[in-house]
């Protein structure tokens, strides 16, 4: 879906994918806006089945990194490698719905189907993400939390290998956040997924991530939640924007 990115891109074979378990390999990645560097020499790998959360301050490069991974930003320096026949489901930070265009949730999802990719059973996806009860409602009338679930269902319809989410719970209350993260963990097992997401919610990040990457233009530290909470660089970075 996003293999045709510019830059020094490579595609792993399926054999390579399962030998080393990596589905994304980022090496020496840099990106600049108007000569101002916002990503500086970033390298990391994503293993099959991981939940990785990217933490960092506003303006630290989290969203830029996500947009590079999904193919929106292409004029980067460095290498981004993907597994062969690799499909990404993307849930952006800001998704606007035109209230002047009548569109039910059901129509929005059905119209998202594409013939180029084998799709999962729609009814199964709708039940798993718990959006059946809002199918007849207008897209412009649903809450932000419901919109995130609809977008998540749309991602799953692509039968992706990984879902990349940019600040998916930023406008949810604490109960909705808890439910959303529990759902993500269930979907990983049911759909055989990997997940990358950005977040500011330290408590939920530590409870629901396999690995945490702390970024402020470059990577300050990374590791499991238990490792990160003991890292001085992490403590210093988080205290500055918490």
Curated annotation (Swiss-Prot):
- In the UniProt record, does the keyword Cell cycle occur? no
- Self-association or partners: how does it assemble? The complex is composed of two ATP-binding proteins (ZnuC), two transmembrane proteins (ZnuB) and a solute-binding protein (ZnuA).
Q: How does it sit in the membrane?
A: Peripheral membrane protein
Q: Which gene encodes it?
A: znuC
Q: What is its EC number?
A: 7.2.2.20
Task: Please name the source species.
Answer: Ehrlichia ruminantium (strain Gardel)
**Free-text function comment from the UniProt entry:** Part of the ABC transporter complex ZnuABC involved in zinc import. Responsible for energy coupling to the transport system.
What reaction does this catalyse? Zn(2+)(out) + ATP(in) + H2O(in) = Zn(2+)(in) + ADP(in) + phosphate(in) + H(+)(in)
Tell me which GO cellular component terms the UniProt record holds: plasma membrane
Its family? Belongs to the ABC transporter superfamily. Zinc importer (TC 3.A.1.15.5) family.
**Organism domain of life:** Bacteria
Q: Tell me where it resides.
A: Cell inner membrane
Keywords attached to this Swiss-Prot or TrEMBL record, sorted alphabetically, are: ATP-binding, Cell inner membrane, Cell membrane, Ion transport, Membrane, Nucleotide-binding, Translocase, Transport, Zinc, Zinc transport
Kindly report the protein's main subcellular placement as a broad class: membrane
SMART domains, per the entry: AAA
Annotated ranges, domain ABC transporter: 24-241
The residues the record assigns to binding ATP are: 56-63
Q: Which GO terms describe its molecular function?
A: ABC-type zinc transporter activity; ATP binding; ATP hydrolysis activity
- Protein name as annotated: Zinc import ATP-binding protein ZnuC
* PROSITE patterns listed in its UniProt record: ABC_TRANSPORTER_1 (PS00211), ABC_TRANSPORTER_2 (PS50893), ZNUC (PS51298)
